[in-house]
C-alpha cells in the first residue's frame, strides 16, 4: 500500500508511472476475479484506493505548479 506521505516525495513522472502500474495490477486482479483465480478479493479495493491516492497527489502537484 502506498502512503500519501511517500507519494508526495515522488516526481510527477514517477507518480504517473506508479499510477499506470496500479491500473495494470487492477486489470489483472479483475481478470483473476472473473476467472475464479483470485483468493484475496480485498486487494482490488486496496489497489483502487492506491490509484486514488496517486491521482490526488498528482493533482495537488499540478495545482502547486500552477500557482508558482
UniProtKB/Swiss-Prot annotation:
* One cellular component (GO) term of this entry: cytosolic large ribosomal subunit
List the Gene3D superfamilies hit by this protein, alphabetically. 1.10.287.310
Which Pfam families does the record match to this protein?
A: Ribosomal_L29
Q: Which InterPro entries match?
A: Ribosomal_protein_uL29, Ribosomal_uL29, Ribosomal_uL29_CS, Ribosomal_uL29_sf
**Which BP terms from GO are recorded?**
translation
Per UniProt, the keywords (alphabetical) are: Ribonucleoprotein, Ribosomal protein
Molecular function (GO) terms for this protein are:
structural constituent of ribosome
Q: Which SUPFAM superfamilies match?
A: Ribosomal protein L29 (L29p)
In the record, the note on similarity to other proteins reads: Belongs to the universal ribosomal protein uL29 family.
HAMAP family, per the entry: Ribosomal_uL29
Q: Which NCBIfam families match?
A: L29
Q: Know the name of this protein?
A: Large ribosomal subunit protein uL29
Recorded source organism is Leuconostoc citreum (strain KM20)
Its gene is: rpmC
